[in-house]
Amino acid sequence: EIELALVKMYKATGDEKYLKLSKFFIDERGTEPNFFETEAEARNEKGLNIMQELGYKYWQAHLPVREQTTAEGHSVRAMYLYAGAADIARETQERELFEVLRKMWDNVTGKRMYITAAVGSQRYGESFSLDYDLPNDTIYGETCASIGLVFFAQRMLQMDPDRKYSDVIEKAIYNGILSGISLDGKKFFYVNPLEVAPEVCEHRVDHRHVKTRRPGWYDCACCPANVSRLYTSIGDYMYSVSREGEIYVHIFANNSANISLNDVNVELDVKTCYPWDGNISIDVNPEHAGEFTIAVRVPSWCLEP
């Protein structure tokens, strides 16, 4: 997450040292001499001391970021890395990096993502495996990985207002992430399976990571805090404004929003019972007359908008 945090610091302070350091981390990942080899030598160790079977793929350090073409390794770390790289691509307006990330997006969502927007299909390393390897019962599908996918999608949207990104955000918030928290908000899933047989989970070691009920807490409690953060900041994902001053409506929900454009403040009042009802009304109230564009997402699954 350091790349994301550094870009936020840059935006808050305007100090380019934070942006440059974030870019440095992106640029250095997977280059030679490999950081992990240097560290191992300093400790008088040989090779990696964790997840050795995955090698440097576990850390997304098997290749420089701009040479990677498939999602590999720890799924949460991968999503955060791609989100951080997208921040750098946007802030520096680097087209090459954006194109790499677009190909990576297509690999993740077209070949390595579940119908629920869960990602990361194997327990070992909480990681990706290979294209179309998406078992329903031994899935890992960590809640944090779907949240990271939303982070990645949001940043790609800021550069390319294509509905394919907001479609995945919507799919994740209603499925792959929402399954990670109980209705009362007190219990959580770390792993989000699509198929559960309680007796199998009890007796088969390769199913032990799959829980039949949401626990109240975890020793590694990243998901409860992350899912709470995501849903309390859901408004950040509903709209965006392009550099040209266009307002994009990405996610539908009952809400009111005040959006600042270059020379006018615009209030949007959205009324809907979505997703239970597909009817959505948007009242547009600018503070004074002016010309601007509002682009409303038509979901890819909507055949008759």
Give the label of every model feature segment.
Residues 1-305:
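Glycan-recognition and catalytic cores of secretory/periplasmic carbohydrate-active enzymes
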